[in-house]
Amino acid sequence: MKTIMIRDDVYKKLLEIKGDKSFSEIIEELIEESLSVRRKKIEKYFGILNEEEARGLAKEIEEMRKRTDEDIARKLSNY
């Protein structure tokens, strides 16, 4: 078990919605709802790229990451 601190206004909001449930149950439900909403937002984008487009995009992202890493390493080496 852990102790957490929350603002008074957040506590009052949780108190309003908790009913007979524990704060842990309410927080867990809110987290699950949030994750569910996030999954649904992400799922709507599945399948919008064909295989070739997806590979091309992945390659571009990898190249951008490599350039960014190189740029950061170069800048850090100047210190």
From Swiss-Prot:
What residues form the membrane-spanning segments? none
State the superkingdom: Archaea
List the coiled-coil residues.
Answer: none
Protein keywords: Toxin-antitoxin system
- Name one matching Pfam family: VAPB_antitox
InterPro entries per record: Put_antitoxin
Function recorded in the entry: Possibly the antitoxin component of a type II toxin-antitoxin (TA) system. Its cognate toxin is VapC12 (Potential).
The similarity annotation says: Belongs to the UPF0330 family.
**The protein's name:** Putative antitoxin VapB12
